[in-house]
Amino acid sequence: MLQPKRTKFRKMHKGRNRGLAQGTDVSFGSFGLKAVGRGRLTARQIEAARRAMTRAVKRQGKIWIRVFPDKPITEKPLAVRMGKGKGNVEYWVALIQPGKVLYEMDGVPEELAREAFKLAAAKLPIKTTFVTKTVM
């Protein structure tokens, strides 16, 4: 599972997920999976989508993960009263804005890439679309 090796602070404020995305172009591979919606991806969701893609292409070609879960999400245990401090870090998320390229792929035919990204998109909680590299 993806998570930072070390952070300056253990816990983070909730914050807001507004603004425009960086990393909107396919830069490593030939095909990409781009976010259309806004939301957050957990490390488990990122890994589940990666596994689905890897199995779909039968481990040929190359896959790049363009998102990293760097925001800790805390939860208080069940049946615990409010107060007494912030809860423990339970999982890590990556904040996603529309237009962000989540995954890239190269070394496979376009039809196979489309099928793999379709399987991966089913594992994710946000709407996505298939994109190809544009040559200028």
Swiss-Prot record:
GO cellular component: cytoplasm; cytosolic large ribosomal subunit
Swiss-Prot/TrEMBL keywords: Hydroxylation, Methylation, Ribonucleoprotein, Ribosomal protein, RNA-binding, rRNA-binding, tRNA-binding
Entry-annotated residues carrying N-methylmethionine: M1
(3R)-3-hydroxyarginine modified-residue sites: R81
GO MF entries: rRNA binding; structural constituent of ribosome; tRNA binding
Lineage: superkingdom: Bacteria
GO BP annotations listed: cytoplasmic translation; ribosomal large subunit assembly
PTM: Is hydroxylated on Arg-81 by RoxA. The modification is nearly suppressed when E.coli is grown in anoxia.
UniProt key word Acetylation: no
InterPro entries: Ribosomal_uL16, Ribosomal_uL16_bact-type, Ribosomal_uL16_CS, Ribosomal_uL16_dom, Ribosomal_uL16_sf
Family: Belongs to the universal ribosomal protein uL16 family.
Quaternary structure and partners: Part of the 50S ribosomal subunit. Cross-links to the A and P site tRNAs. Interacts with assembly factor DarP(YjgA).
Stated role: Binds directly to 23S ribosomal RNA and is located at the A site of the peptidyltransferase center. It contacts the A and P site tRNAs. One of the last ribosomal proteins to be assembled in the 50S subunit. The simultaneous presence of uL16 and bL36 probably triggers ObgE's GTPase activity and eventual dissociation from the mature 50S ribosmal subunit. It has an essential role in subunit assembly.
HAMAP family, alphabetized: Ribosomal_uL16
Protein name (record): Large ribosomal subunit protein uL16
The gene coding this protein: rplP
